[in-house]
Amino acid sequence: LAEAGGKGIETGMTAATIQLGKMGIIHGARTYVIQNEDGQIEEPYSISAGLDYPGIGPIHANLAAQRRATVLAVNDDEAIHAAYELTKLEGIIPALESAHALGALKKLKFKPENVVVLTVSGRGDKDIETYLSFNEK
Protein backbone atom coordinates (compact mmCIF):
# COMPACT_ATOMS: atom_id res chain seq x y z
CA LEU A 1 0.00 0.00 0.00
CA ALA A 2 1.27 3.46 -0.84
CA GLU A 3 0.33 6.28 1.45
CA ALA A 4 0.98 9.98 1.14
CA GLY A 5 4.25 10.79 2.85
CA GLY A 6 3.87 14.51 2.14
CA LYS A 7 7.09 16.37 2.86
CA GLY A 8 8.38 13.32 4.77
CA ILE A 9 6.97 11.37 7.69
CA GLU A 10 9.53 12.90 10.04
CA THR A 11 8.36 16.47 9.24
CA GLY A 12 4.82 16.27 10.57
CA MET A 13 3.60 17.45 7.16
CA THR A 14 2.30 14.08 6.04
CA ALA A 15 -0.79 11.96 5.56
CA ALA A 16 0.97 8.67 6.32
CA THR A 17 -1.86 7.51 8.54
CA ILE A 18 -0.94 3.83 8.83
CA GLN A 19 2.67 4.57 9.73
CA LEU A 20 2.01 7.46 12.12
CA GLY A 21 -1.63 7.19 13.15
CA LYS A 22 -3.04 5.82 16.37
CA MET A 23 -6.19 3.75 16.70
CA GLY A 24 -9.22 6.02 16.95
CA ILE A 25 -12.68 6.70 15.59
CA ILE A 26 -13.30 8.82 12.50
CA HIS A 27 -16.60 9.04 10.66
CA GLY A 28 -17.93 6.12 12.68
CA ALA A 29 -15.08 3.75 11.83
CA ARG A 30 -12.41 2.43 14.19
CA THR A 31 -9.15 2.76 12.32
CA TYR A 32 -5.77 4.48 12.39
CA VAL A 33 -6.15 8.25 12.69
CA ILE A 34 -3.65 11.10 12.72
CA GLN A 35 -4.42 12.66 16.10
CA ASN A 36 -2.77 14.46 18.97
CA GLU A 37 -2.23 13.12 22.50
CA ASP A 38 -5.76 14.24 23.47
CA GLY A 39 -7.31 12.27 20.61
CA GLN A 40 -8.12 15.38 18.58
CA ILE A 41 -7.82 14.81 14.84
CA GLU A 42 -4.94 16.70 13.28
CA GLU A 43 -4.74 18.19 9.81
CA PRO A 44 -2.76 15.92 7.45
CA TYR A 45 -0.75 17.15 4.47
CA SER A 46 -0.24 15.80 0.97
CA ILE A 47 0.37 17.42 -2.38
CA SER A 48 -2.60 15.32 -3.49
CA ALA A 49 -5.94 16.66 -2.31
CA GLY A 50 -7.39 13.15 -2.59
CA LEU A 51 -4.88 11.74 -0.11
CA ASP A 52 -4.73 14.39 2.62
CA TYR A 53 -7.19 12.65 4.91
CA PRO A 54 -6.51 11.99 8.62
CA GLY A 55 -7.82 8.41 8.57
CA ILE A 56 -7.49 5.23 6.57
CA GLY A 57 -10.11 2.70 5.53
CA PRO A 58 -10.60 -0.03 8.15
CA ILE A 59 -9.79 -2.78 5.66
CA HIS A 60 -6.39 -1.27 4.88
CA ALA A 61 -5.78 -0.66 8.58
CA ASN A 62 -6.56 -4.30 9.34
CA LEU A 63 -4.34 -5.61 6.54
CA ALA A 64 -1.47 -3.50 7.86
CA ALA A 65 -2.08 -4.52 11.49
CA GLN A 66 -2.01 -8.20 10.52
CA ARG A 67 1.11 -7.59 8.42
CA ARG A 68 -0.70 -8.83 5.33
CA ALA A 69 0.17 -5.64 3.44
CA THR A 70 3.39 -3.72 2.98
CA VAL A 71 2.88 -0.02 3.64
CA LEU A 72 5.19 2.51 2.01
CA ALA A 73 5.11 6.26 2.56
CA VAL A 74 5.76 8.03 -0.74
CA ASN A 75 6.67 11.69 -0.36
CA ASP A 76 5.63 14.47 -2.72
CA ASP A 77 8.96 14.52 -4.58
CA GLU A 78 8.89 10.77 -5.19
CA ALA A 79 5.31 10.87 -6.45
CA ILE A 80 5.94 13.80 -8.80
CA HIS A 81 9.11 12.26 -10.25
CA ALA A 82 7.35 8.93 -10.81
CA ALA A 83 4.51 10.76 -12.57
CA TYR A 84 6.97 12.63 -14.79
CA GLU A 85 8.61 9.33 -15.73
CA LEU A 86 5.30 7.70 -16.71
CA THR A 87 4.33 10.77 -18.71
CA LYS A 88 7.68 10.87 -20.50
CA LEU A 89 7.84 7.14 -21.26
CA GLU A 90 4.18 6.33 -21.94
CA GLY A 91 2.42 9.64 -22.57
CA ILE A 92 0.08 9.03 -19.62
CA ILE A 93 -0.40 11.85 -17.12
CA PRO A 94 -1.45 10.16 -13.88
CA ALA A 95 -3.54 11.78 -11.18
CA LEU A 96 -1.48 12.70 -8.13
CA GLU A 97 -3.16 9.93 -6.14
CA SER A 98 -1.94 7.29 -8.60
CA ALA A 99 1.48 8.94 -8.75
CA HIS A 100 2.02 7.82 -5.16
CA ALA A 101 1.51 4.18 -6.18
CA LEU A 102 3.98 4.71 -9.02
CA GLY A 103 6.46 6.14 -6.51
CA ALA A 104 6.09 3.03 -4.36
CA LEU A 105 7.23 0.84 -7.28
CA LYS A 106 10.70 2.37 -7.06
CA LYS A 107 10.96 1.21 -3.44
CA LEU A 108 10.12 -2.42 -4.18
CA LYS A 109 12.27 -5.21 -5.59
CA PHE A 110 10.94 -7.56 -8.25
CA LYS A 111 12.25 -10.63 -9.99
CA PRO A 112 12.20 -10.72 -13.80
CA GLU A 113 9.48 -13.39 -13.74
CA ASN A 114 7.19 -11.32 -11.48
CA VAL A 115 4.03 -9.84 -12.97
CA VAL A 116 3.24 -6.42 -11.55
CA VAL A 117 -0.16 -4.82 -12.00
CA LEU A 118 -0.69 -1.20 -11.01
CA THR A 119 -3.91 0.59 -11.81
CA VAL A 120 -3.72 4.26 -12.71
CA SER A 121 -6.99 5.91 -11.81
CA GLY A 122 -8.12 9.46 -12.25
CA ARG A 123 -6.91 12.05 -14.70
CA GLY A 124 -3.67 13.92 -14.37
CA ASP A 125 -4.87 16.88 -16.39
CA LYS A 126 -6.76 18.09 -13.31
CA ASP A 127 -3.39 18.23 -11.51
CA ILE A 128 -1.43 19.91 -14.29
CA GLU A 129 -1.06 23.20 -12.37
CA THR A 130 0.44 21.32 -9.42
CA TYR A 131 2.83 19.46 -11.72
CA LEU A 132 3.90 22.69 -13.42
CA SER A 133 4.34 24.67 -10.21
CA PHE A 134 6.36 21.81 -8.69
CA ASN A 135 8.64 21.82 -11.73
CA GLU A 136 9.31 25.56 -11.27
CA LYS A 137 10.83 25.01 -7.80
Task: Please place each PLM-identified region on the residue numbering.
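Short, electropositive, low-hydrophobicity segments enriched in small/polar residues
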Residues: 54, 95, 126-128
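Catalytic phosphate/nucleotide-handling subdomain of diverse soluble enzymes
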Residues: 2, 10-11, 104-137
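Active-site/ligand-binding loops adjacent to catalytic centers
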Residues: 3-92, 133-137
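A short, acidic, amphipathic alpha-helical segment used as a generic capping/interface helix at domain edges
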Residues: 76-81, 100-110
